[in-house]
Amino acid sequence: MASLLDSVTVTRVFSLPIAASVSSSSAAPSVSRRRISPARFLEFRGLKSSRSLVTQSASLGANRRTRIARGGRIACEAQDTTAAAVEVPNLSDSEWQTKVLESDVPVLVEFWAPWCGPCRMIHPIVDQLAKDFAGKFKFYKINTDESPNTANRYGIRSVPTVIIFKGGEKKDSIIGAVPRETLEKTIERFLVE
């Protein structure tokens, strides 16, 4: 390990450009000033990143000037959360019969778990579909950790799983986080029947 550290050299971005020379006639060293070339550093401020141009003039222990030129670009934009989203209600085992099996319109049920990453990806899609198909379709979510009886009854082995019920019967199921278009086409297929 010691031999490895001995062989590694690290270049410094700023070194003090001080050239001291001692003349034979005086005991005080003379100092020459040199301008250091600008260095660029990546700077983060919230969701923006930019390169900062830092310029320094150095002298022996006095007057250091720093100029920072900033110009940024957005690294990541936050999603618009101001739109009123439809919150799809959660179901429990006790509500299953009346809300899903006895429904007069088709029902889409999303089986999910709080620890499931793909479930969090599909939640906004199901919420948006509930808004788009309001009145034509009912939408519910059921937490498989809190309602294991219903999940076992329908053989849910992986989450997210979306099941469509019509007339109290299971008609179709989709396993995994799928694109919105896949869910939309499946819903539309049951609207024309």
Swiss-Prot record:
Please give one Pfam family short name: Thioredoxin
> Where found?
Plastid, Chloroplast stroma
- What residues does the transit peptide encompass? 1-82
Molecular function (Gene Ontology), one example: enzyme inhibitor activity
Q: What is its main location?
A: plastid
Keywords (A to Z) from UniProt? Chloroplast, Disulfide bond, Electron transport, Plastid, Redox-active center, Transit peptide, Transport
Which catalytic residues are annotated?
Answer: C116, C119
* A cellular component annotation (GO) from this entry: chloroplast thylakoid membrane
Q: Where is this site: Contributes to redox potential value?
A: G117, P118
Q: Which PANTHER family match?
A: GEO12009P1, THIOREDOXIN M4, CHLOROPLASTIC
Question: What the protein does?
Answer: Thiol-disulfide oxidoreductase involved in the redox regulation of enzyme of the oxidative pentose phosphate pathway. Under reducing conditions, inhibits the glucose-6-phosphate dehydrogenase.
What NCBIfam families does this protein's entry cite? thioredoxin
What protein does this entry describe? Thioredoxin M4, chloroplastic
